[in-house]
Each structure stands twice: as C-alpha cells, then as structure tokens.
C-alpha cells in the first residue's frame, strides 16, 4: 500500500493549496481590455505570454504587483494537512515554482507554514529537482508522494523516478497554460 511506503509528501502551492491562476487571468483580462485597439484578445494574450516567458529567467514567475494578493487555502486543505500532521507518519514539504519572495509571502499569508517541515522554491520542477531533494532528505524517491495541480511539473517527474503522484487538476477558466 502507498501509505505504508510513503515517508515524505511534497505539496505544490499555487493552485493546489490556494487559488493563484484566477488573479493572473483577471490581470490578463484587464490587460487585453486596455490594449484592445492594438489587437485581438488572443493576439494580446499570446504577446503577454511570450513576454512573461522571456522575462521569467530574470524576473521570476509573475508580476510583483501580485505580492499582496490573498493566499486563502482551498476548502479542505487545512483539514487535510491537520490530519496528515496528526498521523506523525509523514514529513510534509512545500515545493513550489516561482519567485522566492512571492512564495514565502504567500505561504505566510496562507497560515499553512506551520504544517511544513521545509519550504523549497525552485524555478523548474523536474526529475533532477526531485532526485536532488530526495538525496538531501535521505529518502528514496519510492518513499515520496507529490500532490499538485500540474501533471507535467508536479506528477510526471516523481512517477518517472518511482514515487507517487496525486494529481489535483485546477483550471478555473478551462485554460491550458
């Protein structure tokens, strides 16, 4: 059984523990509305996405104006983390992508920081990152479960190295990004 093997559970943050994408979607709607005389909403969204992607290595993920937005846990998150903590069986680690300052502030604002043994912020989540952390934690990947909304960056890498993935999809507007 999975629960008997797992020693460490990694949680993604944005759109797994709290809503984040909705704020980006709203900002994009305002952006395309303000600039509609220069192109269609699709053209403007594509241009914005390309610019954000190009800036990501330098500026990180997301606009700094989003640093003050709420990070309200989804229903059931606190109850789930409480239950996992009370078992005493698992080390809970928050591993998320993004800007270090932004993620640290969101975890603090969410009130969930008390549940996590460690908070790790990375720019990319993939096989290498999961292997590196499994070595630091002195736990084989076969004893790690990852809970996240992105199959590509949260779930697939851990499965490929023998761990467990718990996919919680989140697409508030049916988006694909």
Model-derived regions: residue spans:
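Generic low-complexity, intrinsically disordered sequence content enriched
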Residues: 39, 48, 85-88, 135
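Short helix-capping segments at alpha-helix termini
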Residues: 36-41, 87, 111-115
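Asp-based, Mg2+/Mn2+-dependent phosphohydrolase catalytic module
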Residues: 1-5, 9, 78, 82, ...
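Conserved phosphate-coupling serine/threonine residues in phosphotransfer and NTP-handling enzymes
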Residues: 96
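N-terminal helical cap/lid subdomain that shapes the substrate entry/recognition surface
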Residues: 4-75
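Short, flexible active-site loop motifs that bind/organize anionic cofactors or intermediates
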Residues: 14, 67, 93, 120, ...
